[in-house]
Amino acid sequence: MKNKTRVSEYYLPLMKNVSGEVKLRSHKYSLRAGLVKQCGAGLYSWLPLGLKVLRNIESVIRQELDSMGMHEMLMPCIQLAKLWEESGRYSDYGKELLKFKDRHDNELLFGPTNEEVITAIVRDDLASYKQLPKILYHIQWKFRDEIRPRFGLMRAREFLMKDAYSFDVDQQSARISYNKVYQSYLRIFKRLGLNPIPCRANAGVIGGSLNHEFHITTTEGGEGKIFYPEEMGELVDEFCKIDPSNEHAVSVMTEKLQELFCFTEECNSSGIGNDNRICTAQGIEVGHIFLFGEKYSAPMQARFSGRDGKKKNFYMGSYGIGISRLLAAIIEVHSDDKGIIWPESIAPFKIGLINLHGESCGFAEEIFSKLDSVIYDDTADSQGVKFARMDLIGVPFQIIVGKNGPIHGTIELKYRLDSKRESRSLNELVSLFSHT
């Protein structure tokens, strides 16, 4: 299906100004560029442009996880309270957990996470060690009743999450699964145009003996300081190139990264002293992974038959990426004073076609017909408005058709990232964008 539209036909409600209470750049641009519309405190409707980006992020995540042998499923938003009572976690979330009853007086909740549900599912289906290991994931909307939702999509009450859960026979096997997800996260974030920093962190209410947060660095909009060695970026790039099927190489590299000094501010108990090899930056958390063993399988009696015929508890891990939050983080990193600059991998449209002269309409239509992933500004607005619109919504490339375009057969190509401009023929453009 062709991904192309005209501005005159598209639902693209842009805003010139936003409330003075809007502080983060991602919050401002998600509203101004017509990605979302706020419906209430911490609640947003996703408009066509924003939904396209959200789906493109999902696609990158699915490609990486599927390539690693993980299996997608879908669990419900609404969960039974009795499952959380089984795990002993029902009271841990406090007022952030939205609780209610149905007409039959059954206690329910709007799930903020899915450890209990997935454990209840597999305890009925995975009966033998021969069926392990398994990693299952889903992408679903979650709800946490934040006392003070703020910063737009960065801390909304309703949010889209990718959750994955691993089931293994023992700790050694579980570490292999953990390392596999660890690498897949680095690959995902790199494909999204980000530089991830995996940091040791607190496990919180999820629990577990081993966990890492994945942060991206930013000059604005950070949640707190992170500390990491200056060689971290090179090591992450090297790790992403390792064949995921090479379990030994993946494990060795994971251990190497985890031995480095990478901490969030709250976990930096040892201090960094005067070591100038340690970098300090503002970080935004975009993912969190946990290895928690039998924390849920033991109280919920989720067991399998081991090689010796004895019943054993699953050794489990949990792995999350906040997808809607990730979109906001990408805007924080990839934007300027004119608007968003989407990485090509997730842009809603790769090309913004701008016709500057009425006499060039026929030529512009010909260009539009031969390209894909394009939004064509066919309105009668001024040149300044058209350029500002394309800069704001962040399409990576702008094709500009002037008065002399049809005469000389040349078209101006502008790169949103650095505003570089160059002249191209239509055939050159078709060839260029058929390979991107």
Swiss-Prot record:
Q: Which GO terms describe its molecular function?
A: ATP binding; proline-tRNA ligase activity
Where in or outside the cell it occurs: the entry states: Cytoplasm
Question: Keywords for this entry?
Answer: Aminoacyl-tRNA synthetase, ATP-binding, Cytoplasm, Ligase, Nucleotide-binding, Protein biosynthesis
- State if Ribonucleoprotein is listed as a keyword: no
Q: Which InterPro entries match?
A: aa-tRNA-synt_IIb, aa-tRNA-synth_II, aa-tRNA-synth_II/BPL/LPL, Anticodon-bd, Anticodon-bd_dom_sf, Pro-tRNA-ligase_IIa, Pro-tRNA_synthetase, Prolyl-tRNA_ligase_IIa_type2
**The EC number(s) this enzyme carries:** 6.1.1.15
Q: Which reaction does it catalyse?
A: tRNA(Pro) + L-proline + ATP = L-prolyl-tRNA(Pro) + AMP + diphosphate
Q: Which domain of life is it from?
A: Bacteria
| Entry's Gene Ontology BP terms | prolyl-tRNA aminoacylation
Keyword Ligase set for record:
yes
Q: How does it assemble?
A: Homodimer.
Report the protein name in the record.
Proline--tRNA ligase
Which species does the entry assign this protein to? Neorickettsia sennetsu (strain ATCC VR-367 / Miyayama)
